[in-house]
């Protein structure tokens, strides 16, 4: 068998060009008998570690290389020309690998101009340990030789002598490590220069290598690769002007095929093996070293600590000394809020944790995290109380990395760091979303831009996305592409093949659609490939030395040299000796911070969380009520229902709620079991009495991973470190390991005097629950944020809601939801006020009631500079009138457009003018503002004061007192504020609408599958269109009390809609819209209009054939309970029931009372209707029972 090594190969990391999937590639090469292979991705090393490990796993020698872009200018960042050449570089050894990383990094940091480029000066300086080849037709030598190309000649190709000169330069730099490449794909220009390359080879004594420009693994993938390129270029496959390959030879050819192609120059094949033998890079992966804290000496000086190695900048001993001192000082501060009788327990635990962290050499890591969190807090940047397993560490609490005391909640340090299984610490930190970047910038400033980088992430062509991309390229309609994509089940990481097996409708679509099979097969071929490179939302790495020595770097923007990004993804950072820190953005922290500021401003009161009881009963009444909108983690409809059922009474209950509200615990029955035990419907039992303390907080149910660890420790006699190893093994479900651990557990239990058989039964129970167990440390830390938001909503509702509105000021739909909540809370929303409003939404009292005033910063076309100028002008007191306002502002910042927006928003209402009067005098207002500004400018040289001079300039008002029509006034509010504030277009129909059961737009997210609903609103807009079949259809925009939404209108309703919108009075009426909907696979529901009804025609919210959503399974068996969802005409008795309080037993009791009282012959009896309320929605169920008013009253008193 011929020996040949592919040395010109593009993996899936040559974004939207290379389609070689690494695992598939490795298996193919192994089958072909290859022993080595190179990667030469375009301009990057993104896939180097992935490539290295994947090839090694199949017994292949990986050669890490790159196809670089080279320009011939003296300065690396020269942008005078876009001309660049290709060049292949291969790392022979560790030095070559280091130089390759540096070259790749510099190509992005300094050389980025359309492409990441290097120049010859840089290449020469960092050429050691590298092999170089002349690359493809775009290589400098080949480009000069190819004078057959008119384009080359036009841009300066000079033929053989110029090629020779270039080759001599490369030979001078790389000596015998420079090679000519010859490719034989059948491309005309390549064939024409072969002889010249061979001639140059002989003349200059430079060896030739045979290469194949490999972009995909199998020959039959050529067409899919064309589709791939179309995705990259935004072209369609049938576009005659798109770039396309003239041949389809860019696949992984076997050694035999390559030998046959180069039979005339067999040495070109042999030379590939020569390069392979020269490349002997062995990477030492998987031994990450935690970074030292660079500024230990400064901290020591500030805290009067004498360091053991005072002269060293980086020292583990120094880190240990400062770390221990800060921990102990931190504990002293924390103990001020802890009962003195427990102090010794805290000191002993801290000592244990400190010693473990020092032994694992993580002191510097902890100091780095402590430092950037401290700085963030000092700058007033909100920081979360903790997240993840770090919340189980007392050290974290003492260093104020977290703000949750782990001891009262039995949080385990070993869940964070296990001394028996060394792994890197992983502390994720939540910061205010708006100011997270400031913390990252602080770290960059402190450690240096070359030592800090964010982490790369790759967008992939996943199942739904690749279907849509391929469908566009293949010219399939958007609607059809959407239909096919939505058939893919909503499962994380599902593949197209798995989707095909699970969803029979996919095959039906493929069979009936003319392009179905083509799109599907291309999508399968391209699925999983990288689409683009981006930046990880949170990941940051910090290094003691320049990062390019561990990972090549890149940057996303050509204008941002400061914020660098690793070329290696998060999965490979530890492999190259780097530890990731996660700087996460959490909007809720900003809400809490803003609410606290508003409380301070209004009541002059500080909120000190350490002094507030986390078991405050009033707060838990709020949570139990289900009115949890805006409360962290528990505001969804499902969570509202759960809290109404569970009725949390203590902080431990919130921790459990956050851990249990997940598919696993809910589907397994754990959640129901937990609730039943809490309410005494099931007895609380413990497998052994010794486990009562561990399981009491969760009523005997194993909810947390920490409980698994404690059970293994107490019963099996394991250390907590050993128990953590057991927990991890349970997660991986290794049968052999599990069998041994079960024996160890039973042996340990028996040794401690426990019944072996009972212990083995307990092991099986643990294994079952371990699959659903949640990290209590994380749940507890987030439960603290839940409690804080619930506390603020309970005691300071106006300030909390104002902060919520500010956090969503650009999300009109969310603001509408919060305004609806404010109505329920009896808090009024006021329009912006020129004298009362600030940048954010704020709380105040009006007529003895709480109100929230619209924030100036949320007004469209006003902008922050205008707001700042307005607030500055108001510093000495409120504006007396419109002239006073105009006399103090800067007209360059508050210009005519800004004034117009403020008028439309109602900000000047308090000055006594109508909005229309101000609007009609806009020219006069602008002119007066400009003149007053000129007067102020000249006041310095005047004998008169500024106020005296400006008072001489007045607005020349055209006297008008009429106001805009109501709908026009509201329209302007909607235009400028995004919502209606002073009223709503549907207000005149409020009584009628309120009497009707309908689905609100804010409940649309609860819609599942397909069905029909009734919506109430007015028509905002309608667009008519013509289909391919020459049928009229359109899109209608409907406005209800909460937001606007679209629905498709088919031909049968188009004329009716057009007649309505032609008549202004009809258009402004409210209607009932019978809407069909599709909400499959977790997608947002799409609507289509079925009928329009006058409000008068809606009798108590009933329309035949309209079915409400969310039916509970208890009602589905008509034969069993006589309930039916089919509406009929009848006199009725309606009983309202809360769905969250219903269970099968209660339904049976109601059923029995109604059945026994059923008497259709009694004249005054009426049909029983159950009105079931759930999370804002309402369902009517019509029974077959005819009963009296007195029986209805009995049921209502007992169950309603």
UniProtKB/Swiss-Prot annotation:
Its EC number is 2.7.7.7. It comes from the Bacteria. It is found in: Cytoplasm. InterPro entries: DNA_pol3_alpha_NTPase_dom (IPR011708), DNA_pol3_alpha_thumb_dom (IPR041931), DNA_pol3_finger (IPR040982), DnaE2/DnaE/PolC (IPR004805), DNAPol_HHH (IPR029460), PHP_dom (IPR004013), Pol/His_phosphatase_N (IPR003141), Pol/histidinol_Pase-like (IPR016195). GO terms for cellular component: cytoplasm. It holds the Pfam family HHH_6. It catalyses: DNA(n) + a 2'-deoxyribonucleoside 5'-triphosphate = DNA(n+1) + diphosphate. Belongs to the DNA polymerase type-C family. DnaE subfamily. This is DNA polymerase III subunit alpha. The lineage of its organism: Bacteria, Pseudomonadati, Campylobacterota, Epsilonproteobacteria, Campylobacterales.
